[in-house]
């Protein structure tokens, strides 16, 4: 069966799989987040990639690229290579699920940690040409200088922005590395070295091969079951039904839409429709 995945040697920091792999390095993750948010993280207590959060068995779950905590902050970091719309409401949902999870574990409202959501976008999410969009809740009536101070912030990086002059050097260099793989700072040099070392590891290569083969199995198994179902209800109907199931499964496993397009042969609009219909 034809492979639709990048060869291991060609993976970059901007590929979802490698992004999560590199960001699991505590030092790199800490430095990237500090650079983006211009804050200090005292000590990371917890860091995980591809974490699934669900507030109840019946609730819609979310799967996060990177989630880390220190003593007073929870930070979610997402890499977005394609504009699937709805990022603002997705950020809102991430933070609400994170808060509910914390209170279910016994945390009082007043003790909730500050919550940050970061979207690193290879497109302009608000089409305003700005390199950096930061949002928090303020008073719209009379005095916008009054802040709600609920401890939540949402940050969107527009990696494609042309004018980065208002960003500091370290953040500019991170943009340049993500966009063009230019190494200009200690942080981007560390990321580049980690990338090279990871790609040189035989076990890491094997893990990636297992990952891609598992995804290819979705297609093979899906079409096989679809054809079998089609014997009873019509070949085309069976294949279409199973294709939708395969798409839903892949979306729930956080597979990028451009990858799903190549595997199942649907376009992005068709996949988005399936995503909406199944509340994935």
Each model region followed by its residue ranges:
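Hydrophobic residues at beta-strand termini and immediately following loops
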Residues: 157
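Short, charged alpha-helical interaction segments and adjacent helix-coil junctions
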Residues: 2-9, 17, 71, 75-80, ...
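Accessory alpha/beta interaction modules
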Residues: 1-153, 165, 225
């Amino acid at each position: 069966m034809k492979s639709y995945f990048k060869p291991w040697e060609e993976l970059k920091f901007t590929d979802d799989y490698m992004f999560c792999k590199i960001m699991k390095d505590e030092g790199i993750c800490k430095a990237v987040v500090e650079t983006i948010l211009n804050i200090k993280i005292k000590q990371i207590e917890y860091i995980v990639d591809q974490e699934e959060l669900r507030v109840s068995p019946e609730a819609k779950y979310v799967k996060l690229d990177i989630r880390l905590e220190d003593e007073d902050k929870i930070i979610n970091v997402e890499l977005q290579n394609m504009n699937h719309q709805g990022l603002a409401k997705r950020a809102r949902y991430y933070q609400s699920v994170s808060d509910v999870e914390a209170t279910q574990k016994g945390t009082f409202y007043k003790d909730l940690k500050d919550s940050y959501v970061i979207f690193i976008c290879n497109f302009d999410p608000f089409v305003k040409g700005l390199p950096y969009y930061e949002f928090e809740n303020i008073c719209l009536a009379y005095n916008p200088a009054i802040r709600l101070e609920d401890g939540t912030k949402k940050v969107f990086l527009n990696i494609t922005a042309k004018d980065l002059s208002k960003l500091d050097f370290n953040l500019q260099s991170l943009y340049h590395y993500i966009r063009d793989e230019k190494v200009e700072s200690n942080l981007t040099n560390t990321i580049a070295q980690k990338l090279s070392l990871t790609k040189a590891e035989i076990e890491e290569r094997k893990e990636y091969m297992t990952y891609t083969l598992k995804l290819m199995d979705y297609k093979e198994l899906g079409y096989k079951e679809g054809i079998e179902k089609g014997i009873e209800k019509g070949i085309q109907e069976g294949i279409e039904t199973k294709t939708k199931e395969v798409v839903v499964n892949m979306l729930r496993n956080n597979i990028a839409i451009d990858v799903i397009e190549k595997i199942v042969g649907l376009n992005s609009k068709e996949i988005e429709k399936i995503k909406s219909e199944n509340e994935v």
